[in-house]
From Swiss-Prot:
Name the UniProt record assigns to this protein: Biosynthetic peptidoglycan transglycosylase
Keywords: Cell inner membrane, Cell membrane, Cell shape, Cell wall biogenesis/degradation, Glycosyltransferase, Membrane, Peptidoglycan synthesis, Transferase, Transmembrane, Transmembrane helix
GO biological process, one term: cell wall organization
Keyword match RNA-binding: no
InterPro entries recorded: Glyco_trans_51, Lysozyme-like_dom_sf, PBP_transglycosylase, Pep_trsgly
Entry superkingdom: Bacteria
Chain's gene name: mtgA
Intracellular or extracellular location(s): Cell inner membrane
Family to which the UniProt record says this protein belongs: Belongs to the glycosyltransferase 51 family.
Length: 242
C-alpha cells in the first residue's frame, strides 16, 4: 500500500473515531438529560420536518405537546403495552423470544418482514436515530436501548414513548393525537379511544385514526381483548407505570 493511501486511510479512521466519540457523548448526555427533562423533539420529528421542507411542503409542522404520565389516561399506557410489548415491565430492553420468532418468520417470508422491537427499543430509535434497517443503525439502537434501560425507570421510558410516538402525519405524542382526533386532553381518553390510537402504531402514515380501515378496527378489537387479559388498569398500578 502506498504512503498516500495509508495517509488517507489513517485520516478517515481518525475522523470516524472522533465522530463516534462525539456521538457517544451527545447520546449519553441526552439520556441523562431526558431522564428528568421533557423531550422537546425527537430525531423522527426532525427527519419528518426536514423531509417535508425538502419536498417543498412548508405547511407541514411536526407537532407535539409534552405531558407527564399523570396527565395521560392509564388506558393509553395499557393499550400500547398490549399492542406493542406485553413483556415491557419484565424485560431489560429486549424480548429475546419475540426476536427469535421474528427471525424465523422473516426467513420463511422474505417479502413480509416482521419486527420485534420493544417499547424501549422504539423509544431509543425514535428519540435518537434515523429510519432504516441497516445493521449499523440496529447496533446503535441496541446500545441506546441498554443506556435508557440502565438510567431510566420503566415509567419514564413509557412516558417518553407516549410523548414522541407518531400517530399520524405531523401528529407526535399522545396529547397532540388526543386533541387532533378526539378533541380532548390525553387524560380523558377512553379505553376504546386508546386502543384505536395504539392500533395505528405499526404504520401511522398508512393507517388512519380519523378514517380507520377494517384492519385497524380489527386490530383495535384485538388490543381491547389483550388489555382485558392483562388485567385492565390494575396492571399499570401493579407495575408502577401509572
Amino acid at each position: 500500500m502506498s504512503k498516500s493511501r495509508l495517509t488517507v486511510f489513517s485520516f478517515v479512521r481518525r475522523f470516524l473515531l472522533r465522530l463516534m466519540v462525539v456521538l457517544a457523548v451527545f447520546w449519553a448526555g441526552g439520556i441523562a438529560l431526558f431522564s428528568v427533562a421533557p423531550v422537546p423533539f425527537s430525531a423522527v420529528m426532525v427527519e419528518r420536518q426536514v423531509s417535508a421542507w425538502l419536498h417543498g411542503n412548508f405547511r407541514y409542522v411536526a407537532h407535539s405537546d409534552w405531558v407527564s404520565m399523570d396527565q395521560i389516561s392509564p388506558w393509553m399506557g395499557l393499550a400500547v403495552i398490549a399492542a406493542e410489548d406485553q413483556k415491557f415491565p419484565e424485560h431489560r430492553g429486549f424480548d429475546v423470544a419475540s426476536i427469535e420468532k421474528a427471525l424465523a418468520h422473516n426467513e420463511r417470508n422474505e417479502n413480509r418482514i416482521r419486527g420485534a422491537s420493544t417499547i424501549s427499543q422504539q423509544t431509543a430509535k425514535n428519540l435518537f436515530l434515523w429510519d432504516g434497517r441497516s445493521w449499523v443503525r440496529k447496533g446503535l439502537e441496541a446500545g441506546l436501548t441498554l443506556g435508557i434501560e440502565t438510567v431510566w425507570s420503566k415509567k419514564r421510558i413509557l412516558t417518553v414513548y407516549l410523548n414522541i410516538a407518531e400517530f399520524g402525519d405531523g401528529v407526535f405524542g399522545v396529547e397532540a393525537a388526543a386533541q387532533r382526533y378526539f378533541h380532548k386532553p390525553a387524560s380523558k381518553l377512553t379505553r376504546s379511544e386508546a386502543a384505536l390510537l395504539a392500533a395505528v402504531l405499526p404504520n401511522p402514515l398508512r393507517f388512519k385514526v380519523s378514517s380507520p380501515s377494517g384492519y385497524v378496527r380489527s386490530r383495535q378489537a384485538w388490543i381491547l381483548r389483550q388489555m382485558y387479559q392483562l388485567g385492565g388498569e390494575p396492571f399499570m398500578q401493579q407495575h408502577q407505570l401509572d
